[in-house]
Every structure is written in C-alpha cells, then in structure tokens.
C-alpha cells in the first residue's frame, strides 16, 4: 500500500477553493506515488469532478442508518453516490458520539462500499495518567468492525491543533497496540501534522500514512508535505 495522506478540511473551504485545489493536485499527481484523500465539507463533495487515479475524495462523517428521520445527517450511500470512497469516523471534534455508534457507522460505511478511517486516541488526562495504551486498546475493541477493510487513525486528542506531537517511539508503541488488535491493519497518525514535522513522522516504524488538518488547506504547503513524504519513501 502507498503512503496514505489524508486531508481533513473540517469546516473550512468553499466549493470553488476545493475545485481549484483538486485542479492543481491533478496537475501534480504524475509526480506523486502516495495515495491522497481529500475530505472537504459536505457542500464541496465532488459529484462529477475529474480525479486522477491516486486522488480520492472522502467525507468527515456519516450516519449509521441508511435513511430515516435524522435531520442534518447524511448516509454512507449518499456519500458513495457523490463519489466518495473514504469517510473519517469517530473524530474527537464530533462530541457526544459513543464507541458503539462509531462502530455502527464503520460497519454501515463498509457495507455501502466506503473505506472508513476510524479515529482513536487518548486525551491529556489519560496521557498524564500513563493510560494511553489502555485507552486506545479499549477504543479498538469498542469501535473497530470485525469484518471489512478500514484504516485506523491514531490521533491523540491533546495533540490536535496544539502543535505538540508525541515522540516517534510513543507513536510506534501505540501503532503496535492497534495492530495487535486489528491483525496488522493500516495505521496512520493525526494530530498537529505539519511541514515542519512530516519528515520526522515519516520515519516511524509501521506508520502507513498521516491525517492532516489545517496544514492541508493551503495547496502549496500541502504539496510540500507530500513532497517530503515522497523523499522519505
């Protein structure tokens, strides 16, 4: 599997910004071997936009039901129809979601033909209490589906948007915990990934990719991150 680079735009960016971004990415894709997944807001999801083969589109959430009276929600089947192939699930910024709901969403996404990127990670209190491995293992047991293909994103809550990143050894240890439960599924890292630290992160043992937040909104900065990954691989 190629190194997976996922851009989570969160609630940022307009449709015109997205179209312009994808156009530039298509122009550069021949020089890129990594797998790129861009996850814009729902309003920018592509429809019939042209994509080169190593670029995919993802969403930032889906409901675990296929249809029904769920105001403001969107189903996995709807995302698939819009051209999505990936969906981020269980991100810590989506508050009040239970582990059980995240697992149901993951199972529904797989049934609908999407590849879920399922987030796990400890908060600051867990980290300071040396409970990181315990928390992540419990989340794996509670959130991850038994069958189907998916990717796990280790994204420590305390690292998101703070500029702080765990050591390479600490990340590698958590990857080992996740893979011991998931039969060697692919694990990516998210949490303050930037141009300044991507070269270092690329050296982590068994890391299959990265989940990038705000650093993915500017095309030139994102492209430089991709270039750094290409050098490492």
Swiss-Prot record:
Pathway(s) per entry: Carbohydrate biosynthesis; gluconeogenesis; Carbohydrate degradation; glycolysis; D-glyceraldehyde 3-phosphate from glycerone phosphate: step 1/1
Enzyme class per UniProt: isomerase
Main location (coarse class): cytoplasm
Gene this chain is encoded by: tpiA
Gene source species: Wolbachia sp. subsp. Brugia malayi (strain TRS)
Compartment(s) where it occurs, according to its Swiss-Prot or TrEMBL record: Cytoplasm
HAMAP family recorded: TIM_B
Keyword Nuclease annotated: no
Phylogenetic classification of the source organism: Bacteria, Pseudomonadati, Pseudomonadota, Alphaproteobacteria, Rickettsiales
GO BP, sorted A to Z: gluconeogenesis; glyceraldehyde-3-phosphate biosynthetic process; glycerol catabolic process; glycolytic process
Active-site residues, Swiss-Prot/TrEMBL: 91, 155
Substrates-to-products reaction catalysed: D-glyceraldehyde 3-phosphate = dihydroxyacetone phosphate
Pfam families (UniProt xref): TIM (PF00121)
The protein's role, per its UniProt record: Involved in the gluconeogenesis. Catalyzes stereospecifically the conversion of dihydroxyacetone phosphate (DHAP) to D-glyceraldehyde-3-phosphate (G3P).
Protein name, UniProt field: Triosephosphate isomerase
């Amino acid at each position: 599997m190629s190194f997976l680079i996922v851009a989570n735009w969160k609630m940022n960016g307009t449709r015109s910004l997205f179209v312009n971004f994808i156009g530039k990415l298509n122009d550069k894709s021949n020089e890129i071997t990594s797998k790129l997944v861009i996850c814009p807001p729902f309003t920018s999801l592509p429809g019939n936009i042209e994509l080169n083969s190593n670029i995919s589109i993802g969403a930032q959430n889906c409901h675990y039901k296929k249809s029904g009276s769920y105001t403001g929600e969107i189903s996995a089947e709807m995302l698939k129809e819009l051209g999505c192939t990936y969906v981020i699930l269980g991100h810590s910024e989506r508050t009040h979601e239970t582990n059980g709901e995240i697992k149901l969403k993951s199972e529904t996404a797989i049934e609908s033909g999407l590849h879920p990127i399922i987030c796990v990670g400890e908060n600051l209190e867990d980290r300071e209490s040396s409970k990181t491995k315990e928390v992540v293992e419990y989340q794996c047991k509670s959130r991850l589906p038994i069958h189907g293909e998916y990717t796990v994103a280790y994204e420590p809550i305390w690292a998101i948007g703070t500029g702080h990143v765990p050591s390479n050894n600490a990340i590698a240890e958590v990857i080992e915990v996740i893979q011991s439960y998931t039969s060697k599924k692919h694990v990516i890292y998210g949490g303050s990934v930037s141009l300044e630290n991507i070269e270092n992160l690329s050296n982590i043992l068994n890391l299959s990719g990265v989940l990038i937040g705000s650093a993915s909104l500017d095309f030139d900065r994102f492209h430089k991150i991709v270039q750094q990954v290409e050098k490492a691989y």
